[in-house]
Amino acid sequence: MKDYRFSIPGELKVRGYCRDLTEYVTKKQLTDEGLWKLFVNQYKIHSDKNGEWKGEFWGKTMRGACLTYISDKNERLYKVLVSTIEDMLSAQEKSGRISTYAEDIEFNGWDMWCRKYVMLGMLYFLSICKSKKLKRRVINSLKKQADYIIERIGDGENKKSICDTSKLYGAMNSCSILEAFVKLYGITKERRYLDFSAYIVNGGFSKNLNLIEESLSKRKYPYQFGDVKAYEMMSCFEGLTEYYKYVKDDKYLRAAENFVDMIVESDYTIIGCCGCSTEMLDNSSVTQTNYSDDIMQETCVTVTFMKLCSKLYLLTGSPKYMDYIERSAYNAMYGAVNDTEQTMKRTDGDVWVEDGCYQVEHEPYPFDSYSPLVYNRRGKKVGGFMVMQDGRSYGCCACIGSAGVAVANLATISAYNGGFSVNLYNSFTFKTEYNGLAVKLECNADVY
């Protein structure tokens, strides 16, 4: 069996258009120290008081930043990430909690989802961290966060079911914390984290339907699952691929592969995204041909689908997953990058209140949230829009986009125990060592 991997820091250097996008995102967002401080502050003041999701911003951006560092090895970026990790560690309560929800309203709404992103942000940082001492502190923080959750969520007496920690989408958002727990088990090898992962998997990711069993049976397409929020559903299957690595039960890999196969058959559009009804799966392989001025093709979905495909590629080596990443990257993903410095003054930033919503002015973001499939204007609305302090605001897609750019970079070339595979037509230089010999691969390409 071939053991596939992507680049480690320093091996790969992309050039041309891909590098332009990487440098733009790094300068515009990932080295903005004020933005990082603002994200961490949401945990210190518990700013999500009414079921919001500002707690996802830090971890989503951190994951993308770490993947960007792996693909580009920008040392200024690394220093900024060390600084924000230190800041986040200072936000941890004595109990182990790191949450934007106050304790008296915890484990509701998006709380588990946001905790997932804190853990994932730290876990991805561990993959680039150069300090053994800092690594130990981060792992200790992760264990405290996870143990706090395990003590309160589960099947035991006086515990809350994970499917009761959110009333949204069958609690798929909460169940997607699986990936974080499996990764933590992979680092610590402490059994309780794998046991908690098994508890999540055994529940099937939703209060309303066992998504794993449905994917194994292929009786329904994902848009027929009932809870059809694409991003959260895909995030659960990302966790399942990680779970498979340790339990080695082929049915879990098969479920994830079937899920992607069914998505591609029923909900994969010409630009490589899914869902033509806002952020929902809706048989968009077909519905993409219907004219619509509504928002659709969410950037969060594009990136998450790319990440899921990259995980399945590393497990299987199947080139079809690279075909999917290629379509998504060169169309929906790159098209969503605001590298032309649009002001976004006409992009709606909606703040919802009891009797409706109102719009607020906001800064331009590095990524658009949605992509039209007809001749139309981009940037109609900010996805997951949240107002914070200091006159600043942000959104979910603005945070996740950097991961999509980085995944496209890393997918360019892979190594395995038998050689190398050039997967995407990008300009790059790749240097590594193979069987004691120095290897250099170079490609000069024009993406478009």
Question: Predicted segments — roles?
Answer:
Residues 1-448:
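Glycan-recognition and catalytic cores of secretory/periplasmic carbohydrate-active enzymes
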